[in-house]
Structure formats: structure tokens, C-alpha cells
Amino acid sequence: MTVTLNLSRPNSALPGKKRLTGLSVPALKAEMEALGLEPKAANMRARQIRRWIHHFGTTDFAAMTDIAKDLRAQLAEKFEVERPEIADHQVSRDGTQKWLTRYGPGIEGESVYIPDVGKAGALCVSSQVGCTLNCTFCHTGTQALVRNLTAAEIVQQVIIARDALSEWPSSIEERRLTNIVFMGMGEPLYNLDNVAEAIDTISDGDGMAIGRRRITVSTAGVAPKIPELGERTGAMLAISLHATNNDLRNELVPLNRKYDIQTLFDAIRAYPGLGNAKRVTFEYVMLKGINDTLAEARDLVKLMKGVPSKINLIPFNPWPGSPYECSDWETIEEFAEVLNRAGYASPIRTPRGRDILAACGQLRSESVKVRASELRKQQASAEGAES
């Protein structure tokens, strides 16, 4: 049975106040300097605030007891450390949790906590609201891009999950949230600056303290940005592959028409630190009668030759109006056996959260791209109603 929880919080930052939740140390330092603090003092205060927000999960400046009382009052006057509004929170019968977070009028993104992944559990975060890639098997691909998420908005997804799991401070033992995967809405490499800044914040040892080796970024194949991702983040790399030849991949992943399979694999081989301790994960959705033959399994083995890698075989998760069916389980197992015999780990991903449309490829919000002038009107109307 699906359980829907009402965990709504006040919408957006308070009028006239800027939200500090999720900001990086450099961004916090800039805000402190804008208050008039000297650079050295601003840096110290930024690090203190970062620790309170991202290590302890604090939502009240009054609790930041190592900051002078008068400065705390000044901070409370100009800033706030609340969470963004949770428009919807659903819990699947298998323990998967999905949040629809509202960052502003018409700006909503989804994130999903998946138990029993990695050391304990993984949070699948979104990097954009909507997507430009139009992958034909993906529900997000049916939603036009609304906008990139900021670094702080990406980090806020992690904070919201930690709130729900009661995992503050970051130093507690036996955490249930140990891994972060950028496999939600959007193409992370089309928002690399914000993704890289978010990873810096998430992996900060004095903040959230989730190691970079426990953070995976998945791309549909923005080849020129792949080496840069490794250089800037040190994160693990995942490739949304799904086909072994250009004709089929052009259909399933239209980005392949711009960066074909050869170009993609050249970029993968240039990923910094690639080796047995840092393998690429290839994601391969199993589509009945489309890409699931044993010949294609053998072609996949040839394609991966010389690339330290593993393959996640993903049973297709249907969504309303989807044009595909999932491969038969026997077919998936036979496909995996070909890969296993060739020496590649090829786990079959257990579908999680299907009953709440939280499984791989099922994420989609109802946000649509609205003109900036219209958003301003909506914001003004909302603020007028509150006053």
C-alpha cells in the first residue's frame, strides 16, 4: 500500500530574506562580506554557518552558539535557514521515498531515497527541472526543460532526505543515506558548474561528509564534458548507454546523433583516475524486442573492451503512455550471463518505488517553462495573498 505523507513546509524563502541552506562555503563567505565583514572574518563565519547547517542540520540561527549574539540577530534579520517547500512526499511499500520539492512558483523537482543500495542507501538527486534530451524510454524526457537547479537546490535535496531519515549530525554511525547518485531529472553535464559546486558541498568533511567515491554522476553522453567532470569533482562516472550501435542509440538517446558511440568511448577512456578501483558504470535498460538479444550482449562486451567497468541491467519501468515493454526476466538473465562469462559484473537492478513512479526513468514533475515576467507576477500575487 502506498502511503502519502503531508510534510509541506513554507514556500520559498521568507519575503526579503535569502535562504542560506545548501550554499557552499565560498557562497556563504560572499554573503558575509556583503554584511560588511572583513574577508578573514567572513571566511571564518561562513565555515561556522556551513557546519551548523550541513553537519548539524540546524534551522535556527539562535542555535549557532559559537557565533556572537549580535551577529546571529543580524543574520536572522537578513537570512533564513529553513528548507524549501515539500509539495509531496510519498513512501513506497518497499521503503523507497520520493519528494517533490517546490523551489519557487512553477519550479518543482523530484528526488528519491532508495534503501539497500551501496553501503546502506542512496539518494537519487535531480540536476534540472525537466530535460532537453528526449530519451524515448524516460518519463522525464517528456517534460521540457524548465531550468537548471542551483548548487544550493541540489544540496537541499540531500538535506530534506536527511531530515526524513533523522540523520543529523553527519557524524552519526550506521547512516542509512551513504551514497548520492545524479540520476534524477535532467542531464548533469549540462549543468556542470552547479553540479560540481554541489558535490564540493556534499563531500565537505566538516559538513555532510559523503565521500566523492560515494557520489556517482550519470550522463547520457555529453562527451566533451566527461573528462572535465572527473577533473572537477572526482566523482564516479555512469553512462546511460542502452544500445551498442549508433542506429539504435540515435533512436533511444537522441544525443547520440551529436556525440556518437566512438566519440563517447574516447571521452570515457580520458576520464581521470579510471581503473579497477574506479570503474565506469554502464546503465542498460532492457527493452523487450528492442535491445535485449544475446548478439547485443556480445556486442556490449566488445564495446567495453579495455574500459574498467560494470554494467547495471535495468528492467524497464513503465510510465503512463510509455511505448516500450520490459524484457522477459529469462531474457534479462541470459543477457547478464553473457556479460558475466566475459568477466564483467552485471547486476540486474531490482525495481524500487514503481508504485509511486519513483523507479529509474519514471521521474517527472508538472513544472512547465514559464516566462520570467509571468513568474514575477505569480510571486507578487502569492506574496500579496500572504500579507
Swiss-Prot record:
It comes from the Bacteria. [4Fe-4S] cluster binds at C131, C135, C138. SUPFAM superfamilies: Radical SAM enzymes (SSF102114). Disulfide bonds join C124-C360. One of its GO terms (cellular component) is cytoplasm. Residues 117-349 form the Radical SAM core domain. S-adenosyl-L-methionine binds at G186, E187, S218, S240, L241, H242, N317. Specifically methylates position 2 of adenine 2503 in 23S rRNA and position 2 of adenine 37 in tRNAs. m2A2503 modification seems to play a crucial role in the proofreading step occurring at the peptidyl transferase center and thus would serve to optimize ribosomal fidelity. Belongs to the radical SAM superfamily. RlmN family. This is Dual-specificity RNA methyltransferase RlmN. It comes from Hyphomonas neptunium (strain ATCC 15444).
